[in-house]
A protein has these predicted regions:
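A contiguous loop/helix-start segment that scaffolds small-molecule binding in enzyme catalytic cores
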Residues: 1-2, 99, 168-233
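Glycine-rich, flexible N-terminal cofactor/catalytic loop recognition
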Residues: 1-55, 70-79
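Acidic beta-strand-to-loop metal/phosphate-binding motif
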Residues: 32-34, 101-107, 111, 170-174
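Alpha-helix capping/helix-boundary segments
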Residues: 37-39, 108, 137, 178
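Glycine/small-residue-rich loop that forms an oxyanion/phosphate-binding "nest" at active or ligand-binding sites
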Residues: 54, 75-136
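Intrinsic disorder/low-complexity segments
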Residues: 55-72, 232
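Short amphipathic alpha-helix with an adjacent loop that forms part of the alpha/beta core around
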Residues: 88-95, 162-166, 214-217
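Class I SAM-dependent methyltransferase SAM-binding "motif I" and its flanking Rossmann-like core
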Residues: 112-166
Length: 233
């Protein structure tokens, strides 16, 4: 019987990946991911950069479970929001004999990414589910925002209908195309709110700044919006 490893991957800077994550990803025979090409490229880079180091280390990657392999072809299984329900059973069947790593395109899986149904079913069937923690864009943005951190609400992408509770720092993901529309809605509903925007975290063009009401923002790449009003501190 295999294990399910929920593995965090970098949100931008590859050097943020943990040694343990590298060991797991290079050892498991099966990886459930969003974009198989993107994850395949990540594995290729990890092998090129770290394979020799890891396997010459006094503490090399441990033998995991069924199907453990250093070399050879890995199986990649695409898991998206629209097909996760039908992929659950495939992952469960693979876990009967093999270890499986679950990753997202970037950051910590399940947080605004698919994977919840797989983890839930694996636990229901008594498979061992292991956390391999690491980068999370929402937490990274909060930690450098200067906003209160004692009470934080993570939204991911906002639903169609939403209200923000006072006294919390709200963490919102948004696309560059919809950013200004969302900012205007927040300004109208909560004119006293303090808004901080973080873009391209850990990348070359990383930027974080306080938004001024009424201004249009020109951004690119991944965007995290942080909102606080009625401060808790």
């Amino acid at each position: 019987m295999g294990r399910l490893y929920v593995v965090a991957t970098p949100v931008g800077n590859l050097e943020d990946i943990t040694v343990r994550a590298i060991k797991i990803l290079l050892s498991v025979p099966v990886i459930a991911c969003e974009d198989t090409r993107r994850t395949g490229m990540l594995i290729k880079i990890l092998k090129e950069r770290y394979s020799d180091f890891l396997y010459s280390h006094p503490n090399p990657p441990p033998k995991l479970g069924g199907g453990n392999q250093r070399e050879g072809v890995k199986k990649y299984l695409s898991v998206r929001d629209w097909n996760e329900a039908e992929q659950v059973e495939k992952v469960m069947q693979l876990l009967e004999t093999d270890d499986v790593a679950l990753v997202s395109d970037a950051g910590t899986p399940l947080l605004s990414d698919p994977g919840y149904k797989i983890v839930r079913e694996a636990r229901k069937r008594n498979f061992e589910v292991m956390s391999v923690p690491g980068p999370f864009a929402g937490a990274a943005a909060v930690s450098i925002s200067g906003l209160p951190t004692n009470k934080v609400m993570f939204w991911g992408f906002l639903p169609k209908k939403w209200d923000l509770e006072p006294g919390l720092t709200h963490v919102i993901y948004e696309s560059p195309v919809r950013l200004n529309k969302t900012l205007k809605k927040i300004e109208m509903k909560y004119p006293e709110a303090e808004i901080v925007i973080a873009c391209e975290l850990t990348k070359i063009h990383e930027k974080i700044w306080k938004h001024k009401n009424g201004e249009d923002e020109k951004v690119r790449g991944e965007v995290t919006v942080l909102v606080n009003f009625g401060r808790s501190w």
